[in-house]
């Protein structure tokens, strides 16, 4: 019954075909019984993960300033290998042809092209300027103030996914409690928020008077960002020499 079986995995426009010929090599016979070597199932799923997982991989990002930068971070596709091995074992036991997506521990925006798609928040830490693109259209840009470099709170670069968004949060740390209207964390305790205690943003403020790592934004910009972001939206932070206080093109 395995000889004519076909299981097709789809990842966007890409396909992986597991056919009877390959399944046949996973079988063993004992006492007139056919059994499947489960380690072969796990190995196959592991090979899918190493081919299609994008989390923590390096990828290029074309900045709004023109040049490309390389970013990596926890954002990206990640196959749930344990869950998928169990699902594949079940599909094989049923002996039916199946076309399916693998089980994911984490999803991204796209399988084709860049996994971050065309809706994301772009954060130029050098220029202290950010953008939000929605389906390729720029809907927001704003100066900001990031982590205080002189105190060792430099905001790290990387590609992340927004964790959640919350109104009226109080951000607490050692020796401070800051009430904010809009809170949007994306990298552990680092997130975007309004900063009513500041009246200037951008430039080189961050070097000596920056935040504890968060992206401090003007109220109106934080509000617009809050209204348009969602859990999982890509947040791409980078440094780009030559754009200090630079204008976006």
Regions found by a protein language model. Give the residues of each.
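Active-site scaffold segments
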Residues: 183-237
